[in-house]
Structure formats: C-alpha cells, structure tokens
Amino acid sequence: MTEGMCDDMVDGKYRGWADRVADTLAKASPNFSYVNLAIRGKLLNQVIDNQIPAAVPYISGPETLVSFHAGANDVLRPNYQAEIAFAKYEKGISDLSKTGATLIVFTVVDRVEGNGKTAQLWHERFSAFNVNVRDVAKKYGAIIIEADDAKWLADLRFLAKDRLHLNSDGHWRLSQAVLEKLGKDYDPNWKIPLAPAHKKTWFRKNSENLIWIITFVIPWIWRRIRGRSSGDGRSAKYETPISWK
C-alpha cells in the first residue's frame, strides 16, 4: 500500500498516499526529507528483516514519522498462521518503537462483498488482524488509522482493477485521513462518499468477475505455486533520504 500501488505514475513510480502526505509535510518544513522503502508483495518477515533495519539509520527520534503497514500479504496466504503473524507484527513495531520515532499503523477493511466462504474467511482473518493492530498500537503508543472511520473504503470504486489496492482517488482520500490524524492541513472532502452506484446487470457483473479472475486471481495463484512474488527483483522507490518539495 505504501509503495503507492495503482495510483497515478510519476517519473515511472506510483505516487501513492505516502508521497501525497509528504507533499503537505514538506511545505511546512524546508529541511523535510523522505524515504519510502515499501515494496509490493512482501511478507512480515521480509519487512522486519530487510526494511526495518534499512530504515533505522534514518530515524532521529520523534520528529521522524514512520508508517508501518505489513501483514496483509501474510493473511492472504493459504498457510497463514495468525499467532505467528501477530507476534511478528508486534516485533516490527517493538523494533521501531525503540528508535523513538513517531509511529503510524493501519487497520484494514475486514468485510468484502458476498456471503460465501471466501468473504467469511476474509472477515475472520482480517477482523482478528485488526484487533492485533489495535492492541499493538495501544501498547507502543502508535498513531492508528482506522478503516472503520473511513466507511468509503468499502466502496469498490476506490479500489483498482485488482480489487486489492487503492486507485488514485483512494490514495488521495487515505492521504487526507492521515494528514487529519496528524493535525496537518487536509481536505475535509475526503470523508464525503460517492453517490450510490448504478446497479449492474447480472451479465456485466459476472463478466467483470471473470475478467478479474483471469487477469489477477490466476496469476496470483500461479505465483504462489512457483514460490514467487510480485515484488521479486524490485527495489524500493526511495531507499535513501531525498529532499522533497
């Protein structure tokens, strides 16, 4: 999410909510610098073992804002073990907390359309994931961005065609939610939901579902079978601090 997946592209990189937040923060601080170590598809152990150690040298106490959003990719795996993932998540926050940084974490939408087994499993896993995020945030004093406070997130029109990542409008709204939580300038229109969507015909809805399965679900399953990830071979957008204006 923090890489900016499925937002508009700028200079060959997804823009994303974090870049948008950086735009506002930089206006208030002439010495503002920005690092974005997020890489799509990474699991908790990869974030903890690789990204956190890479971030620590650039943290200088509470004036450094660090966002941590990891674990959702673990939840989506068939062999997901909640207790192991929860412990890893807390370790990540614990490691970052020791630096004195100001931490920000996120819950996720724990309900999706439908009443089948997939929707039920999604709710069971992600509702428990959210409870863990809240508990860890409280324990370590992290700022939490609550999906429950942003009902618009349940609207599929804010998701990209993969139905997993935010689209451009979704990233913009999330950036404004974060800025509001931080007490910075923000656009209150982020809270306004879209007008009710027109009801789709049975044919259109099922055609879109079929296209989605062919375009996104099958490739995802094929990567899992081969032990591959969409983030393999990719580097972070901004691995070292850059001046942001």
PLM region spans:
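Serine-esterase "nucleophile elbow" of acetyl-processing enzymes
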Residues: 1-38, 52-62
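Oxyanion-hole/transition-state-stabilizing segment in secreted/luminal serine hydrolases
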Residues: 3-5, 30, 45-84, 110-111
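A structural motif corresponding to the C-terminal end of an alpha-helix
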Residues: 24-29, 92-104, 132-144, 181
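Structural recognition of the beta-strand scaffold that forms the well-ordered cores
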Residues: 33-38, 64-69, 103-107
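Active-site segments of SGNH/GDSL-like serine hydrolases
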Residues: 69-73, 95-127, 148-154
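Charged helix-capping and loop-helix junction motifs
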Residues: 82-90, 122-129
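Substrate-gating cap/lid alpha-helix
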Residues: 113-147, 168-171
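Conserved catalytic region of serine esterases and O-acyltransferases that act on ester linkages
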Residues: 139, 162-165, 169-245
